[in-house]
């Protein structure tokens, strides 16, 4: 009986927290069903009435009048291309850093890690000018800019995992005649799957939710 009472209290607390977290999301959904003028005049947290109800007309207008599908496509392309580029380049970079123990690899590692503490706002104007000069100001090349900003976290995560990967497996593959690229793609990549998934989720959430960088750089 005492155990049941102890389990009820955390359940109640978590339920209240869940309701508080879900409530704004539900209100966003309800406000999307109101007429535009009612969103500000009737209050954000008020349920739509018969006078303010607009149904799915707002969604139809966003698709037909505001190029929502085009914007969604660009967001999808930028996110997928950026994440794929980050995963490929940073996993290879981390492999080099761990396996080639030299001054260059150490400098490269600390340079990537240091990039995590550099906010975009600090280099925003310079980067915008550079992106215009190098033609990195469109949805298909901005992924190179995202690679630069996302490399720090990705290299840091991949480096830690590669250090725990046994070198003997790679040496055995090299003895069997595998080239370095074959060792990387056929041996290391399958071992790195957990880290690849974790890094992909983090980078995808960051790129997808980012607004300031593409707003500053992209010219369509």
Per-region residue spans from a language model:
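A structural signal for multi-pass alpha-helical bundles of membrane permease subunits
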Residues: 2-218
